[in-house]
Amino acid sequence: KKNTKKDFPQDSHEQLWGAISAVFQSWQNQRAKTYRRLNNIPEEWGTAVNIQSMVFGNMGNDCATGVAFTRNPSTGENSFYGEYLINAQGEDVVAGIRTPRNITKKERLESSSEDLSLEETMPEAFAELTKIYKKLETHYRDMQDIEFTIENKKLWMLQTRSGKRTAKASIKIAVDMVSEKLITKDEALLRIDPKILDTLLHPTLDPKAKKNIIAKGLPASPGAATGKVTFNADDAEQMKANNQNTILVRVETSPEDIHGMHAAVGILTCRGGMTSHAAVVARGMGRPCVSGAGVIKIDYAAKLFKVDNAEVKEGDIITIDGSTGEVMLGEVKTINPDISGDFSEMMKWADEVRTLKIRANAETPLDSRTARGFGAEGIGLCRTEHMFFDEERILYVRQMILSKTKEDRLKALDKILPFQRKDFVEIFTIMKGLPVTVRLLDPPLHEFLPKTEKEIDIVAKSLKIHSSEIKNRINYLHEENPMLGHRGCRLAISFPEIYEMQCRAIFEALYELQKQKVEAVIPEIMIPLVATEREIEILRELVDRIAQEIQKKNNFKVDYLVGTMIELPRAALNANNIAKHADFFSFGTNDLTQTTLGISRDDSGKFLDDYVENKIFKIDPFVSIDQDGVGELIKLACSRGLEAKKNIKLGICGEHGGDPDSIDFCHRAGLHYVSCSPYRVPIARLSAAQASIRAKK
């Protein structure tokens, strides 16, 4: 009455239609919109309403209600798993109002609980439930999430559905079901959401690290997380926007907290079980979660929680381990995961099916090792400018930029050459036998110059010049729109000696490896920001000239490719002419998206959400390829490039290279490889396999 200004209806039909209407209206509430956005669910789908007669689990001690999974949703273990409450209604189990009991005796003993399991208190109902869950899983050929009620000792099944599970459990269940001949390998591959693999590829707590454990709850969602304590979902979202990791601490979570749960790196609740809202949502999101930590007493008004004599305030750092249920004060050291077993088996199946090659974007030895460890088949983007920012070499780079004559520039470049050569030797050694795409210098020169007065004075003193010279050079190099300014191949047209030095470093590194009898890589030298045929023609001649010079001088031969990034619409439209001088195209989808849509990636955050909400874009085009615009240019460039050169190699190296939907597009567009960040390589491998399977259907 307070909300509707009407008395509660007494007519049962009016009540029923009111409930049905409420479900339909819930599709447009804020938490539903957030959930759709996070899970890429189309708004036009709508929601269904199920109507069924009621049974009661709260009529006495011979009644109960529960939630069960046909396999463990956290580990994937093939054992019946769940929770129940005596004399309670269904929502009580998941709402976290009371801490529920285990369903099986085995679970109870493992958790050291004194509360008897369903198997012990109601053995007949448990036996019937066991038969039914096995039948349901065999029928649906997937792990089931079951809700049931026991009314006066009689078992009623309320619903069954495919259960949410952790990434680890998803893979184990899929691999086990193939072994059990319930599903095929292709079905197993299609069942894994590639994005959830992220949760398997990040650190866990170092078992040797010192831990100040202040509480222990239920291990609701695996993984470890460290962050600042916050008690409010909105604050968690704001802190994430400020690049702060947070642990969202709540008595219990509800659907209103979903945006904060997504923003937080971990979730801690003091009420609720393994099937509570916090546990289920955290598992689905891949967030570590500890639930049911009853010793924690939260004071929302004072913005703190107490455990015995300890007091933890908002902003204090804690660590949670969702695999053990431990809550610790401060930051605890982590270790990288060991990827093997079921994960390796699944990746092996994916590699057998996919046709797209998977490379990584890497420019340091550490990145290269990580990429190779995750199964990368080469480097699709090695950004050479990142090598310039090292403390040892940035001074020489600045000296080169500040030089007034070509002679002075060459002297500075001679000092940079050994550093670049050393970097390439390391990377080529790690990636031996695989292709490595080296992008020659791309950013505008002003990015390498000092920014503050203090930095300017330090550089001036080091180079023995007046600070005014540096300021004058900074002013001269300043650009209103540097993304479209004097960068990429345009720099090399003005200052060819920069690309000459980089090419020398590449070919001298190859000679070093040949002397050491290291298996050769095939370098793919990539020229960025090409818009015209003449640009690539001039710079191809430069690369070939340096290659011949180094090979002749050292009496050795090496295979190499020269290609370009397609990141401007004009380049895509003129791909047939550009292909005459290129061995490969690599689509730089970050800049191609910016230049096609006329949208700055750095500034788009202010309005892109409005565009998605108003259905102008289905999804952020910097996250997933805009297939109707950017995608059409890519397909056109591929077609025209192949017309001019049948064996031209085609790939992408933008951020989209790790996005499953973009990878599916790349497969359909006929690209040969995608390149992504090292930690997204397994995601790309699985996504490419799924694209291949879908294409066969």
Language-model regions, residue ranges each:
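Hydrophobic alpha-helical scaffolding
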Residues: K6-H13, N40-I41, G57, T75, ...
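Generic beta-strand/beta-sheet core signal
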Residues: I51-M54, T65, T70-R71, S79-N87, ...
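Conserved alpha/beta-domain cores
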Residues: I339-G341, W349-K697
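Acidic, glycine-rich flexible loop/linker segments
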Residues: T199, T204, N212, A220-A236, ...
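Flexible, glycine/threonine-enriched loop-and-boundary segments that flank and lead into catalytic domains
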Residues: R31-A68, A233-D235, N242, I247, ...
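Conserved catalytic alpha/beta cores of large enzymes that bind or transform nucleotide phosphates
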Residues: K1, S79-T160, T166, K172-K208, ...
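Extended, highly charged
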Residues: K1-T75, N87, R98-T104, R108-I132, ...
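Extended active-site and interfacial segments that coordinate phosphate-rich ligands
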Residues: M59-P123, T160-A188, A263-I298, A310, ...
